[in-house]
Amino acid sequence: MEDKFANLSLHEKTGKSSIQLNEQTGSDNGSAVKRTSSTSSHYNNINADLHARVKAFQEQRALKRSASVGSNQSEQDKGSSQSPKHIQQIVNKPLPPLPVAGSSKVSQRMSSQVVQASSKSTLKNVLDNQETQNITDVNINIDTTKITATTIGVNTGLPATDITPSVSNTASATHKAQLLNPNRRAPRRPLSTQHPTRPNVAPHKAPAIINTPKQSLSARRGLKLPPGGMSLKMPTKTAQQPQQFAPSPSNKKHIETLSNSKVVEGKRSNPGSLINGVQSTSTSSSTEGPHDTVGTTPRTGNSNNSSNSGSSGGGGLFANFSKYVDIKSGSLNFAGKLSLSSKGIDFSNGSSSRITLDELEFLDELGHGNYGNVSKVLHKPTNVIMATKEVRLELDEAKFRQILMELEVLHKCNSPYIVDFYGAFFIEGAVYMCMEYMDGGSLDKIYDESSEIGGIDEPQLAFIANAVIHGLKELKEQHNIIHRDVKPTNILCSANQGTVKLCDFGVSGNLVASLAKTNIGCQSYMAPERIKSLNPDRATYTVQSDIWSLGLSILEMALGRYPYPPETYDNIFSQLSAIVDGPPPRLPSDKFSSDAQDFVSLCLQKIPERRPTYAALTEHPWLVKYRNQDVHMSEYITERLERRNKILRERGENGLSKNVPALHMGGL
């Protein structure tokens, strides 16, 4: 009852303070939630947030900012609320305690009513609206400085709140009590209404946010992998000498060799067990019946099978994608294009490749990204070292399209400037692509902004530019394909062969239907016309955008770092503004020739129509100068990698730390 009386003495100032405290508490809770969500490693959340920021930047460029209004009004309201008349009526009382985090919905709703009643009503309005209250006797306890009531009617609009006012003496307290109790007759309390005793409100405590660990990949795909990763090692036997491919523009010979290799078949009692050190991951029905290779469309009734299969096989993971996944045969089908299974890949033109997981021996991990890992493996039947790219399917239809595009590009393009493709297979929710192993890795491994390594020298830079341009030119002229994601991490090099090749065609597109999707590729290397476009879906993505990305990549390899100012790295909008509004970066004149500077300047023209074509770039004097020269690329890559590994051993680190811009995106 004392709490009910105390609620009547609440002033508007106290209500505002309570609201401010609640707002601060809410903001703290919100920040806690944001911090928790920021630790998620889910690629879709990170990508969605980045796209939202880019979209906000585009809208800011189209709209004029108006002067902020309302600040004067807020100052006037603040001044009026703190006028001398109001200050005299304020009773210095502590804020009411906040509700318990685990309290019921009723208590939360009643607490919100107290805040609303305290903040929006003056003392007079509160007294006039409380017609159900019946205060018959008031006792002032000076020792405890609490105002108590012996008899008080229950007010259903205001919950019980423990408020301890500051009372200096008996006279002042009695005077205040009289002011709060005008001489008027209160209505009788209804006899039929019974109200339960409300519990005491405990101090507010922020709800604990429980970070539920995401289910592991092996658990989601039904695999029981060892802690160290996928084990593909065989028992000790006669050592075989691994072979490396000689530089060759075609992989036809090796594909035929792989097609003739035998597949070890047989039922296994435990699909997730390790047999002879080889991870057994055979899919359901793959060894009990013939593989569905008639066409590339799923059989009739796959939709029903997927809905009724539950969690068996791949049904639980791909229940909504029956048009791609054939549950009965355990295959991944792209209508009219290709079909993937645990035994290999079949293309619609009749060509096929037979590589299985049992034939691969894991050697090392080359890299990892948001959708999977890249591993160095040995194909035991042919004794060929390969690189397997694992792409996990996360119920994202866009990922299916990326897999289809990359497999099509790799299959169609036999070029000395594009990585060779050996085959692919599909097992338990992941696609494994077997490609040529490039022992030098991506080009970002052979340059650094530190003085110990530095950027790539001009002769080798011209060799790299020539190889990349020829690869992009073949994609465009022979296959009508644009890459859309040209950057140093998607360009591979081989120290053994001294070659440079393009890879990663997941976001590539056909020029016939080249309407670009929003923010395809890495935003750090995106052309300015794509960033500032308000409707990128309607803007046709041309090869000119790839030429901008090529120029920016060459400049980064020359400098050893991302070419835009480091002060823009931490702010996405600053980096976008530098790309769109700022002048394009240039090669330093003291280290590079005028021909090299002119080549980069042509690629980084802000107006797309002013950028040269691939044919014009191949005949540029800078590339012609070094075309017939031996730049000793193999020795150069080897020396750079050895220098890098030596630095890492001395520092005891796994990789060189780099100042990465905010727009950089990881992935495979």
From Swiss-Prot:
Compositionally biased residues, Basic and acidic residues:
1-15
Catalytic residues?
Answer: 485 (proton acceptor)
Tell me what gene encodes this: PBS2
The taxonomic lineage of its organism, from the top, reads: Eukaryota, Fungi, Dikarya, Ascomycota, Saccharomycotina
* Record's protein name: MAP kinase kinase PBS2
Phosphothreonine carried by residues: 518
* GO BP annotation list: actin filament organization; cellular hyperosmotic response; hyperosmotic response; MAPK cascade; osmosensory signaling pathway; osmosensory signaling pathway via Sho1 osmosensor; p38MAPK cascade; protein import into nucleus
- Which segments constitute the Protein kinase domain? 360-623
Q: Using the UniProt record, name the top-level EC class of this enzyme in a single word.
A: transferase
Q: What does the record say about PTM?
A: Activated by phosphorylation by SSK2 or SSK22. Ser/Thr phosphorylation is also necessary for SHO1-mediated activation.
In terms of InterPro entries, this protein maps to: Kinase-like_dom_sf (IPR011009), Prot_kinase_dom (IPR000719), Ser/Thr_kinase_AS (IPR008271)
Q: Which GO terms describe its molecular function?
A: ATP binding; MAP kinase kinase activity; MAP-kinase scaffold activity; protein kinase activity; protein serine kinase activity; protein serine/threonine kinase activity; protein tyrosine kinase activity; protein-N-terminal amino-acid acetyltransferase activity
Among its keywords, does the record have Mitochondrion?
no
Q: What is its EC number?
A: 2.7.12.2
